[in-house]
Amino acid sequence: MKIAFTVYNLAFVSNWIERLMPYWENCEIVIFHIANLQGQKEPAIEGVKSYDVSSRSYSEIIDIIEHERIDLWINFNFRSLFELFFQRICALQNIKSVYLEHGFFSQNTLHFKTQKAQKNIWETVNRQLNFWKKYIGVLYHAKKRLQEWRILQQVYFKNNFKYSPFDYYFIFSQREYSLLSNVFPLDESNTSLIGYPIFSSEKDKKEATSAGLKMNGEVLYVHQPFILDGYATISYEEEKKYFLDLEKQLLKKYKRLIVLLHPRENLSTYIKRFADTQIDIIQSPNNYSCFTDKSLIIGHYSTALLYALYFEKPTIILNYPSVKNDPIFQECFPTVEDMENICTIDFQIDINKKIPFAGKENTYEHIA
């Protein structure tokens, strides 16, 4: 079987594709990405065929797809014109399409990141023009042009995603099923609840469970790229002050603060920025061991907080300067409005939310 992936950001390669590959037998992997358009370095992955379609036309992309003879196409997202472009090609070329959930559904999922677009206006304009040039090919070459135009209007401009459904949906949990049922026509025949992947394999899962959990006195802060994505109006230096103020409060009770940096942020830049502090900056996507020995987890609405929920770690939702928290995890974790109260609150979590939110199985092996 030949499986293709739409890769908007190369972080999906290391965070998902490379984690799934060991469990696929007799499968060829092809990725279609826009590294050049995104200013990223093109990946070189053993066993994976890679196509940068940044500067390729609709006709050139179709030629590649027909040459590769794709059996199954996987999308991690469904909101951008880039992803809709490949989804419509699948529908027109009779290629089975799959939506593989990579992050929790939130109030931001169905909306464009307008703050980020305004912050990087010319990059955004260039990227959107690139997508539109490609998509015009879909409209022009389709046998039912009027129908394709109506689908574009409904999906892209009106958020009516049911006009362009996937063939299959792999989503984390019952919570996600309930929400995404309002977006896509989900039912038992086309949807699988796969569980959020905490572990690589069943073996890792058993080893972690048998090892037990520890409390080492350290605090793990799960970072979100609020500044990078344009959600926050503060500067990186102001963010540094925010972390230093947080550390000052935490040291009244805990040993040290560790910041788990978001995968899309630049690790070396952050390490240099915090070189004159005692705050540790790490970047270790999909590594459950970052959570198992911590005494407290702090976050906002990152999907990575599912690790904390899975391991039943004391966890709080903390306000971030100039950003309104998404209410995703308010059902699971307490919210602290003022960081001065961070060491005085009893951090009780609702473990009954574990399966409804994180699902079952929870391995890449199971998803594959």
Identify the function of each model-found stretch.
Residues 303-361:
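Catalytic binding pocket for nucleotide-activated donors in carbohydrate/polymer assembly enzymes
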Residues 130-228:
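A nucleotide-sugar donor-handling region in carbohydrate enzymes
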Residues 7-8, 32-36, 100-105, 195-197, ...:
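Short loop/turn segments at strand-loop or loop-helix junctions that form parts
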Residues 53-65, 260-311:
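Donor nucleotide-activated moiety binding/catalytic core segment of transferases
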Residues 91-115, 119-139, 220-222, 316-318:
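Active-site proximal beta-strand in glycosyltransferases
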Residues 16, 196-269:
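Conserved catalytic-core segment of nucleotide-activated headgroup transferases in glycan assembly
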Residues 33-45, 222, 244-284, 326, ...:
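Catalytic donor nucleotide-activated moiety binding site of glycosyltransferases and closely related
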Residues 1-119, 232-236:
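N-terminal pre-catalytic "stem/leader" segment of glycosyltransferase-like enzymes
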